[in-house]
Every structure is written in C-alpha cells, then in structure tokens.
Amino acid sequence: MTWLITGGAGFIGAHVVRAMLEAGEQVVVYDDLSTGDPARVPDGVPFVKGSTLDRGMLDRTLAEFGVDGVVHLAAKKQVAESVALPLHYYRENVHGLQTLLEAVTTAGARRFLFSSSAAVYGLPDVDLVTESTPCTPINPYGETKLAGEWMVRAAGAAHGMATASLRYFNVAGAATAQLADTGVFNLIPMVFEKLTQGHAPVIFGDDYATPDGTCVRDFIHVDDLASAHVAVARALEARGDGTDLTVNIGRGEGVSVREMIALIGEVTGYGPDAEPTVLPRRAGDPARVVASADRMRTELNWTARRDVREMVASAWEGWCLYHPEARR
C-alpha cells in the first residue's frame, strides 16, 4: 500500500514514517513545515509541502501517488495555546481534518489512521483508563481530538473506509538523536532545558492523592508508538472495509513526576542539581492518567517494549546533539 503521512516531518511523524518503511509500505510525506523539519524525511521518500486546509494540493497529491491509506498526524497540539487560541485550533485540527477526509473519500482511499490523544478523557477518576472511559475533554485541544474521532468514524461508516483512532499517552524518547523532539513543551525536554540553564526543575503540586504526592502519567517510547501504527494498519487490512478501531497507546504503567525528574538526574549525571522546586498545582492537571493497554495486547498482539530509562536516555542524546553544552 501507499500511505500518505500528514505531519510526517514532525517528531512523531518521522518515527511513523520510519516504521512504515521498515514494514515494507510505500510512504508519501505531507507536511506544512510549521513545526516539522524536512531533514527528518528519509532520502527517496516523496515529500509534499502543503496544508491539510489546501483541498487542491491534497487532491493532486492523492492522485499523483495513488494513495491507498492515510496516517493523519498533522495538528496543533499545545494545550495552553489551545486555550488562548481556540478558534485557531478548531480551524487547523477540525476543519483541516474535514478537508482531508473530503479529499480522501473522493479519491477512494480505503484506510485512515487518526492521531488522537489521552486528552479526550479530561480528568478521569480511574486507576486505568480504558477505551470505554467517558470522554470529557477540558480544553480546546482535547475537544478537537474528540471531534476528530467522531468525524473519522462517521466518514468511514459512510464511505466504507476502515478507520482507527489512536489515543496517545505521554510520548517520549527517540529512535536516533537526529529524530529527537526539539520542542520544550513536554516534561522530559522541559526538565532538560531547566538543567541546561542551571535552574531547578519545577513540580506543579505535591499534594495529590498519589504515592509521592505528584501527578502520575503513562509514558510511551515514540518508537513503540510508531510500531503501534503498523500494528493498527495491519489490523485494518485484516478486518476489511468499514472497520473502526479506537485504541489506547500506552504502557499501562504509571510514573510520577517526581520519579521522572529523579531518573532524569540519574541518567544525565546532574544528580542533586535535579532536585525540583515545588510550586502550586496548575488548574486542570489530573492526579493520575494511566492507560489500560489491554485492547492493543489482546486484540492486536502489540505491547510496548521500551522502558522509561530508555526514553530518558535516548531523549537526552538528542537534546545533547542540539545543546552540546548540556552534557556533563
């Protein structure tokens, strides 16, 4: 099959491209480069610079490359920014997806994988979040992802297209230093940045109902996340047209913010310098969000293989590639 991977020049997208190629699939990368880097696109892989809001460019790309399936990763994804710029997020994430689905269904593509998020769950009050846990997003970003799931499912049902929504938990790590996340919007790179600048990492709240009082999250290595896309793509092919899947992509194991910062101090060699400063809670931070990974394991025979230490170590190698002054 030939897969169009939107956002394929981004951090996660580049890993998905790599996994699909290794699985023997043909890939076309489609990215507007607002946050992506064309250097992440492998040699020999067709690259089209374009927006999912550009119907004409989408139509031409789908026709030129004979696209059979789509992995849609292109989106705006910063929670705080979505609160400040909600209409921008709805335009990019919802209207952009609508435009893409219109083009894809017109072109006759048969498979569609949608990059969703654990943000659709909002503030779940359960030990393990299953795919049937109620979805009550608490910010525009999460709302756009839930609306996206609805649109993808409805389009698939109407047009006989096999669809899947993959709800990512906390993505970390890197397959290679060159593919590492260069942003500082997630916990691990945020701690790296603080340590590099000579500042203490920050914990927002240590009075949660968790073992050490700090928030607990489920971290997934980006390489495992990428392999999950291959597993889901294979499942859609096996199950046929009209299939719809919704799956959590996580490890099913919680790590507290304090535990993660301590591990970062150990892996990076910063040790005592990684002792965090504790500030008051941020509004809207749930105490615990950890995936139940049972559906991926039992129905698709997929499990995450890499542990949290591998995530931190590989992310650190990437950070030091771009910030050599950070290494001790």
Report each predicted region and the residues it spans:
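C-terminal substrate-binding subdomain of Rossmann-fold SDR/epimerase-dehydratase oxidoreductases
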Residues: 195-328
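Short amphipathic alpha-helices and their capping/turn segments at secondary-structure boundaries
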Residues: 59-63, 189-197
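N-terminal Rossmann-like NAD(P)+-binding domain of SDR-like oxidoreductases, especially those catalyzing
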Residues: 1-167, 171
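Short, flexible, glycine-rich and Lys/Arg-enriched loop motifs at helix boundaries
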Residues: 38, 169-187, 197-217
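Short-chain dehydrogenase/reductase
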Residues: 90, 138-146, 181-189, 218-219
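Short, solvent-exposed loop/turn segments at secondary-structure boundaries
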Residues: 84-85, 140, 177-182, 287
